[in-house]
Amino acid sequence: MLVSEFDYELPSELIAQHPAPQRTASRLLHLDGRSGELRDLRFSELPRLVGSADTLVLNDTRVVKARLAARKTSGGKAEIFVERALDARHALAMMRAGHSPKAGAKFIVGDGVQVIVEGRADDLYRVAFSEDIEGVLERFGAVPLPPYIAHPAAAEDAERYQTVYAAAPGAVAAPTAGLHFTKALIEEIRGKGAAIAAVTLHVGVGTFQPVRTEQVEEHRMHSERYAIPPATIAALAGRKVLAVGTTSLRALETWKLTGKSAGESELFVYPGFRFQVVDRLLTNFHLPRSTLLMLACAFGSKDNVLRAYAHAVRERYRFFSYGDAMLIERCTSG
């Protein structure tokens, strides 16, 4: 299967640079993957689409201020993007320093925090901090906005690039389908009799990386940490599962495939994948050729989803992290 099959034309002005004025003010495109029917809705209408047979699964990961401005000991500028903390003072990170730093290279963050490169770890670097990483990120870190958002991170982003139910620090990108929810909307859904459950999948830096292969099947998926508590597993039994975001879906389907309720997920979902847990998917509009778009196409069928995207472009929906959302009913044919 060619990666080019998941391309589409998107006018740049449809890439949302800021969130909607209110979280629930976004639009919602409802796609029935079985019939192909499309409906243009508002996100605030979501509660009327759920009922007492449903379990809504949220990803409660919390975005950390992972982007650090740094300087070389020679005085040049650099950037350290912390992908994950390994312990209190060691991390895996992306480095932007003009050239690939070698083991032993030193960088300075803020008022004198030293960061020393210890070596490579695939596409990342293992680095050591002279102070606890959590405190360094809180004092000097910036919200790691996606590269297609042109403005520097501001106070608005610290609030709006975070879900209202975020609890477990560890993500370097938001699970964006959840950005549309308010606590009041969640309670309205609960009032319909739906169960609300949580998983944790810490979105990694790989979510920003393009697919570089020509064939879909040759792409190597990045690894992300996930955990599913026993209460969530219990809440799935005998119910229709609505996954809020591709990350929630990947955590649930990884658990079903491996039998492990916690660990590392490298699950790559593309057309042909057999879903065993999730019945409905709430997700934003994704980049052309991305693994996230491939997942959506696997769930709702490629023809249906790409037709829905063409409709969204015509109707001037807002795209990507700060954009509008889709609710996809799983395609059960094929």
Task: Cite the ranges covered by each PLM segment.
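Surface-exposed, charge/polar-rich loops and edge strands
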Residues: M1-G334
